[in-house]
């Protein structure tokens, strides 16, 4: 793939090959077990990230916005003899200084799917305490154990407060 850094921007473009061998571990949204099969995908992607944070860890001001676009095919042109399906992923977060000890950290994530037939492996899913625990596009959802399939379009928000105790020691509360 191709990567280019221009000041606070990072641009990426490329293609990837993915192969999935499904067993009987996947379930549809109606609760029925999906039939075992295998799929291969030839995917194209573009990504643009703007990062103005002052620090990599515990930033005090700035923002990070990432926009990604994907087109999924099975032969490089079509998917299942039809038009390919796609997705757009947006992740935006910022650090706002309220005073010398308190910081407000809002965040917004979304994943939008487009197309006629989207296989179960690329459906939106959520669960666990961290992003990308089982699948790269899995969104964290503290109250959900394991992984659950979601609707085609998902938008989530998070608001966190950070308190600097002393020096490099912080407490963060998020919800």
Residue ranges of predicted features:
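Gram-negative (and chloroplast) outer-membrane scaffold detector with strong preference
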Residues: 1-3, 168, 173
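Aspartyl protease catalytic domain
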Residues: 34-36, 41-44
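A charged, amphipathic alpha-helical module
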Residues: 28, 32-34, 48, 54
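Edge/loop elements at the starts and ends of beta-strands within beta-rich repeat scaffolds
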Residues: 4-8, 39, 55-60
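C-terminal outer-membrane beta-barrel translocator/porin domains of Gram-negative envelope proteins
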Residues: 44-49, 53-166, 171
């Amino acid at each position: 793939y191709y990567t280019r850094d221009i000041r606070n921007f990072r641009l990426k473009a490329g293609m990837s090959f993915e192969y999935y061998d499904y067993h009987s571990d996947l379930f549809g949204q109606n609760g029925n077990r999906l039939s075992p099969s295998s799929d291969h995908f030839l995917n194209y992607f573009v990504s643009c990230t703007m990062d103005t944070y002052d620090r990599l860890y515990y930033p005090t001001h700035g923002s990070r916005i990432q926009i990604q676009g994907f087109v999924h095919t099975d032969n490089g042109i079509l998917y299942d003899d039809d038009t390919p399906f796609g997705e757009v992923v947006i992740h935006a977060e910022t650090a706002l200084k309220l005073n010398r000890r308190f910081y407000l950290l809002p965040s917004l994530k979304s994943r939008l799917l487009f197309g006629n037939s989207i296989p179960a492996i690329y459906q939106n899913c959520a669960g666990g305490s961290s992003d990308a625990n089982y699948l790269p596009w899995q969104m964290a959802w503290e109250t959900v154990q394991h992984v659950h399939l979601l609707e085609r379009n998902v938008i989530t928000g998070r608001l966190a407060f950070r308190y600097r105790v002393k020096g490099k020691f912080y407490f963060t509360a998020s919800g």
